[in-house]
Amino acid sequence: MLRYCLHRLLIGLGMLLALTILIFVLLQLTPGDPIDAYINPNVAMTQAEMDALRAQLGLDRPLPVQYLAWLGQAVQGNLGHSLQRFNETVSGLIASRIGPTLLLMAAGLAIAIVIGVTTGIISAVRRNSFLDYSFSVLALLGISSPAFLTALLGLYVFSVRLKWAPSGGMLTPATDFSIPDLLRHLALPALVLSIGHAALIMRYMRSSMLETLNQDYVRTARAKGVREFWVVVKHTLRNAMLPVVTLIGSTIGLAVGGAIFIESVFNWPGMGLLLINAVETRDYPVIMGATLVIGACVIIVNILTDLAYAVIDPRIKVT
């Protein structure tokens, strides 16, 4: 097990390194001068002053040297300073934003798992029934709907028209922190984030349950007079969950992408909103730092998913 974890960790580090190189190259290919993000447009600067500032920031060095310098600092935990918020470090900005993003993703995935697994089981057990057809149609709609469109539609219906949920933010301004207020703001973004993932989980769960229900040991349990409820819970559910666990781990990356759109629509103060603002203002250190942290989180979750797969099914050996 330890050898497997180290092997996967080394592969993950290689993928993370490749990701940072790709983002660094793409940032260099974007039009414009990075120094523009550091200059106050209301203050006139001579070319000599701009060259001095560029040298101070290390932007006059060759690109490979710039990347290696950034990587060396990142390994030590120093992700640099924001070009737009001069007194704030990138690490500090990420630390203040990663909590809300993790909360949003955890809530969204929890809702998706509950809805997807439950409806998948019902559809499989009640195959070709009205419920089965209804859940299948809803799942198809959920998979086909883009995250940004679902977010805008949910915002319009539940916030603008029905007034059931706040239109944005994480807490009500000028009020003390309270759990009920946080949950009111969290409910709609988390529900919107869960829709596509719940649809995928439902389809996988239904297919896996149908396959497992046709196994010989399930038919034997039924022949012995075991109640259908216990046939599903004790003899079918655990084995049917194996491909779903893999799917849940693989959807973490998709959840990150969905969270970026949803945070921008609902003004949720997380990593997605931070990354979008950094791209808009060409804040390169924040873009690189946020990309590094997001990539590391996705890789770690994928490793944990593989380990969970082995725990659920002891027959599987990780080597």
From Swiss-Prot:
Start and end residues of each ABC transmembrane type-1 domain: 98-305
GO terms classed as biological process: peptide transport; protein transport; transmembrane transport
Classification via SUPFAM superfamilies: MetI-like
PROSITE patterns given in the database record: ABC_TM1
Transmembrane segments: 9-29, 102-122, 138-158, 182-202, 242-262, 284-304
Localization terms from the record: Cell inner membrane
Principal cellular location given in the protein's record: membrane
Entry keyword annotation includes Protein transport: yes
Recorded topology in the membrane: Multi-pass membrane protein
GO cellular component terms attached to this protein's record: plasma membrane
Domain of life: Bacteria
Alphabetical keyword list: Cell inner membrane, Cell membrane, Membrane, Peptide transport, Protein transport, Transmembrane, Transmembrane helix, Transport
Function: Probably part of an ABC transporter complex that could be involved in peptide import. Probably responsible for the translocation of the substrate across the membrane.
Family according to the record: Belongs to the binding-protein-dependent transport system permease family.
Known partners and oligomeric status: The complex is composed of two ATP-binding proteins (BRA0404 and BRA0405), two transmembrane proteins (BRA0407 and BRA0408) and a solute-binding protein (BRA0409).
Protein name as catalogued: Putative peptide permease protein BRA0408/BS1330_II0405
UniProt source species: Brucella suis biovar 1 (strain 1330)
Lineage: Bacteria, Pseudomonadati, Pseudomonadota, Alphaproteobacteria, Hyphomicrobiales
